[in-house]
């Protein structure tokens, strides 16, 4: 097999790694929906889904079958093309955002020198999906939910990006692998604690998760921008939301908690355990916090998160300049 050159083998292995990592992310996002319902049942002193399979283990399969056979309905006066594209853009952008996350020293889909900027770009692209969904549905509740979601996401992406600049300044690179290697001695969560707090809050808001789920507030907007979606289109939005949680959790681990670094266990196991911990924290937050008003969410972002990120960035810059002297 003379055509099987070393360069071609490297390319095929890279493609295989990318496919495996992205499939694992999609699977984790899907299974998180089942895990969330089980954990919410535990937190609220009830059973949760336990009828399909042993202990409810096949509930996810039942949900997938139900969603697959539901009518793929499109509203009569909607923009059919944009209405169909919106869930695809949402799912794809959130999945591609995970591509820059290194799960071990040798396993990463795209080891980009502008990794953090690529993530912020994909997070911004997801806003278009929400706007497209709300506008193309020709529904006032969808449009209001899309306007809420876009304003909230764009606002908190500012704090999300600023909270990462301290980490970038310390590592001297936008590359995620370089940032992880820079945490071999001390995790960034210690010198960048306020940056981590702001990133965690902004990450929950960007994912539209409770308590920042005003764009989907059932009591006010009847499920917001995807009220008109059903079948697999709704499934793409649904799984995409959980993929966003997986991505934000993985970024917390990579940027602030040493990535794959840890004693005794293999690097991938450490990364998976840390990521699973933060995924559970998302669920715990949903189970324990009330939903504030929309104006309170926006006010909190601009009056609390923004000053905190700016102070953190200024202090980090001052410390780096002092150490350089």
From Swiss-Prot:
GO molecular function (one): quinone binding
Keywords attached to this entry: Cell inner membrane, Cell membrane, Membrane, NAD, Quinone, Translocase, Transmembrane, Transmembrane helix, Ubiquinone
Domain of life: Bacteria
Any GO BP: aerobic respiration
Bilayer topology annotation: Multi-pass membrane protein
Subcellular location: Cell inner membrane
InterPro entries reported for this sequence: NADH_UbQ_OxRdtase_su1/FPO (IPR001694), NADH_UbQ_OxRdtase_su1_CS (IPR018086)
Assigned EC number: 7.1.1.-
Main location: membrane
Reaction(s) catalysed (UniProt annotation): a quinone + NADH + 5 H(+)(in) = a quinol + NAD(+) + 4 H(+)(out)
Coiled-coil features, chain-numbered ranges: none
Transmembrane segments: 11-31, 81-101, 114-134, 154-174, 186-206, 237-257, 265-285, 304-324
S-S pairs: none
Record-level GO cellular component terms: plasma membrane
Known role: NDH-1 shuttles electrons from NADH, via FMN and iron-sulfur (Fe-S) centers, to quinones in the respiratory chain. The immediate electron acceptor for the enzyme in this species is believed to be ubiquinone. Couples the redox reaction to proton translocation (for every two electrons transferred, four hydrogen ions are translocated across the cytoplasmic membrane), and thus conserves the redox energy in a proton gradient. This subunit may bind ubiquinone.
Quaternary structure note: NDH-1 is composed of 13 different subunits. Subunits NuoA, H, J, K, L, M, N constitute the membrane sector of the complex.
NCBIfam families associated with the record: PRK06076.1-1, PRK06076.1-2
Protein family (similarity comment): Belongs to the complex I subunit 1 family.
Protein name as it appears in the record: NADH-quinone oxidoreductase subunit H
Organism: Enterobacter sp. (strain 638)
Gene, per the UniProt record: nuoH
């Amino acid at each position: 097999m003379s055509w099987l050159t070393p360069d071609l083998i490297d390319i095929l292995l890279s493609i295989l790694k990318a496919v495996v990592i992205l499939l694992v992310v999609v699977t984790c996002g899907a299974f998180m929906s089942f895990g969330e319902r089980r954990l919410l049942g535990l937190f609220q002193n009830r059973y949760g889904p336990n009828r399909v399979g042993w202990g409810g283990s096949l509930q996810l399969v039942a949900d997938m079958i139900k969603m697959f056979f539901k009518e793929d309905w499109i509203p009569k006066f909607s923009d059919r093309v944009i209405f169909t594209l919106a869930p695809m853009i949402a799912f794809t952008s959130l999945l591609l955002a995970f591509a820059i996350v290194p799960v071990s020293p040798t396993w990463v889909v795209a080891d980009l020198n502008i990794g953090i900027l690529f993530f912020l770009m994909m997070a911004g692209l997801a806003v278009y999906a929400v706007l497209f969904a709300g506008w193309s549905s020709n529904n006032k509740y969808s449009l209001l939910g899309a306007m809420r979601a876009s304003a909230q996401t764009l606002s908190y992406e500012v704090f999300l990006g600023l909270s990462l600049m301290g980490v970038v300044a310390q590592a001297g690179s936008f590359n995620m692998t370089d940032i992880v290697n820079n945490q071999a001695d001390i995790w960034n969560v210690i010198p960048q604690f306020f940056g981590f707090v702001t990133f965690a809050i902004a990450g929950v808001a960007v994912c539209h998760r409770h308590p920042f789920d005003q764009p989907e507030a059932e009591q006010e907007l009847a499920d917001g921008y995807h009220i008109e979606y059903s079948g697999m289109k709704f499934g793409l939005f649904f799984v995409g939301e959980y993929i966003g949680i997986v991505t934000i959790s993985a970024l917390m681990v990579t940027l602030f908690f040493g990535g794959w670094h840890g004693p005794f266990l293999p690097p991938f196991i450490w990364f998976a355990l840390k990521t699973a911990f933060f995924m559970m924290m998302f669920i715990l937050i949903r189970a324990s916090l009330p939903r504030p008003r929309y104006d309170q969410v926006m006010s909190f972002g601009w009056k609390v998160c923004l000053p905190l990120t700016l102070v953190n960035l200024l202090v980090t810059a001052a410390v780096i300049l002092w150490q350089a002297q």
